[in-house]
Amino acid sequence: PHAVVKLNLFEGGSMVHRELIASGIVSIFQKLYAHSWGPRLEYILRNTLLTLLSQNAKLEDILRMLTDERYRHKVVESLDDLVLKNFWETEFNKMQEKQRIEAISPILNKVGQFVTSPLVRNVVNTNQSSFSIEDVMNSGKILLVNLSQGKLGEDNTALLGAMLITKIQLAAMNRVYIPEEE
């Protein structure tokens, strides 16, 4: 029996990297759902991601941020970023309930599809990844990942594969901060 690998896209989010991480996650969902993508969906998702990247968040917290008023208030109160704070307080919270439900439904649908899958949830519902892509890259290790569509299903395979590629891209971009002599 193989141990379940844990993967959290939200970790490692220093101020410099948060925008890259949010952009990477938005790109994943945009590629998976290109046929039903829109500017409002992207705007709300991006603001949600940037907000959660300042927390110790995981994928399912996107749903919680959009639907749980008490949780959202607590998170927004802790924000240092005034632009994000303004989004939640003057845009999102001022929407009529019907308008808000209409705006967040596509996000809940897309993210919820993966969070409700026990297979995906076992991998992404974690505050810390079980391995470091940076460590794999910087120490010359080999990473083998079984993303069999027969075991996971096509959508789940696409999501997990895209998440892994995004983590690899972010780790590669972080290498610019490693001194040349290392």
What is each residue range found by the language model?
Residues P1-E182:
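P-loop NTPase motor domains
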